[in-house]
Design a protein with these regions (language model features):
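Long C-terminal subdomains/extensions of small-metabolite kinases
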Residues: 1-164
């Protein structure tokens, strides 16, 4: 989704290099987010919840982020009701919103007031599978993980897995 595209672009961005040189590197994310918002392709997505097999269809998906905390690493509270102790994941998504309107919705997202806006959806389940109509950029906590069409997220209750 949008955040993943921004993370991927930031890896090799001349904008980031320039802004870092003039000590304004923190603006990189904002500049690339606005630029990407108007140029990115959206995708059709099918979300399947593993606990009840409920299916959600998200049209013109801008992003879908699976989280077990209220805010992502950058501090944006995309899942304001998420809890790391309930064994559930919260899939926060934006879909079916015209790009120009999405730009004006960003402040509501940052203020955790986006859930009442049509096109923002939060789905909760211990297992979430997302299937998209075309490969989309995926990242994990800001690290680029490739372009994929299918991904499964699972909340492992009372577990902490570390990479070797």
């Amino acid at each position: 989704g949008l955040d993943a595209i921004v993370c991927k672009k930031a890896l090799h961005s001349n904008c980031k290099k320039f802004l870092n040189r003039i000590h304004l590197g923190k603006l990189t994310y904002l500049v690339l987010t606005v630029q990407s918002l108007f140029t990115m392709d959206t995708a059709e997505a099918v979300v399947e919840c593993g606990d009840n097999h409920k299916i959600y269809r998200l049209h013109k998906t801008i992003f879908a982020a699976a989280m077990n905390l209220q805010a992502e690493g950058g501090g944006v509270p995309m899942a304001p009701h998420a809890s790391c102790t309930d064994g559930m994941l919260s899939l926060s998504s934006a879909h079916g919103i015209p790009k120009a309107i999405t730009f004006f919705c960003l402040p509501f997202l940052v203020a955790a007031k986006h859930e009442k806006i049509r096109g923002f959806t939060t789905i909760e389940s211990p297992v979430i599978r997302v299937h998209t109509s075309k490969p989309v950029v995926r990242h994990a906590d800001g690290a680029y993980c490739g372009d994929v069409r299918n991904v499964e997220f699972t909340c492992l209750s009372e577990k902490l897995q570390l990479l070797k």
